[in-house]
C-alpha cells in the first residue's frame, strides 16, 4: 500500500521542519499516529491507529529517522527483535515556494494490516486529515 498527500502552508520551511522531523509531535496533527514516544538515537515507539466506524485497527512498531536534511525527512520501521517485519516508510518532502512551503507526505506499507481495501481508504483518509492538522499547528506556533 502506498499513499501520498500534499499541503501548501503559508509559512517558511523553517516553521514546518520542527513539526515533521519529530515523531513525538505527530499525535498533535496526524490522526493516524496515536502515540509516539522518543526512545533516543532518532527512534520512536509508535502506535498507529485507524478507526472504521466503531472498530479500530492498531499497530505498534519502532520507527527510526534514517534521513534528515533541509528538504527531506525519512522514517523507517526498524525493529530490534531480530525477526523479519513488513516495511513501513514515511517520507516527508519540503519545498520552499516563495512565501509558502509545500509539504509532500509519502507512506509505503508492505504488510497486510491495512490492505483490506476499505482499510486502505481509511488509512489514506487519516493521512489526508493530517494535512489540515499540520497547517493549524504551524500557523499557531
Where are these regions (language model features)?
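Hydrophobic ligand-binding cavity/cleft-lining segments
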Residues: 1-43
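Short, intrinsically disordered, mixed-charge
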Residues: 18-31, 124, 128, 132, ...
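Beta-strand/loop substructures that line and gate deep hydrophobic ligand-binding cavities in soluble
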Residues: 76-129
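Solvent-exposed residues in well-ordered beta-strands and their adjoining turns
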Residues: 8-12, 47-51, 66-68, 93-97, ...
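Hydrophobic/aromatic beta-strand elements that line small-molecule binding cavities or substrate pockets
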Residues: 5, 33, 60-67, 87-96
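Hydrophobic pocket/interface hotspot
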Residues: 16-20, 26, 44-46, 65, ...
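Glycine-rich portal/gate segments that line the openings of hydrophobic small-molecule binding cavities
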Residues: 37-79, 136-141
Amino acid at each position: 500500500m502506498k499513499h501520498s498527500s500534499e499541503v501548501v502552508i503559508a509559512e517558511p520551511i523553517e516553521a514546518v521542519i520542527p513539526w515533521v522531523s519529530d515523531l513525538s509531535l505527530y499525535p498533535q496533527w496526524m490522526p493516524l499516529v496515536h502515540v509516539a514516544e522518543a526512545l533516543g538515537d532518532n527512534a520512536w515507539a509508535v502506535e498507529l491507529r485507524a478507526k472504521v466506524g466503531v472498530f479500530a485497527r492498531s499497530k505498534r512498531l519502532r520507527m527510526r529517522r534514517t534521513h534528515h536534511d533541509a528538504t527531506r525527512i525519512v522514517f523507517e520501521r526498524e525493529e530490534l527483535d531480530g525477526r523479519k517485519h513488513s516495511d513501513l516508510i514515511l517520507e516527508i518532502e519540503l519545498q520552499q515556494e516563495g512565501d509558502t512551503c509545500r509539504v509532500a507526505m509519502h507512506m509505503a506499507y508492505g504488510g497486510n494490516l491495512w490492505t483490506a481495501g476499505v482499510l486502505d481508504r481509511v488509512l489514506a483518509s487519516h493521512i489526508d486529515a493530517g494535512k489540515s492538522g499540520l497547517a493549524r499547528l504551524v500557523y499557531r506556533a
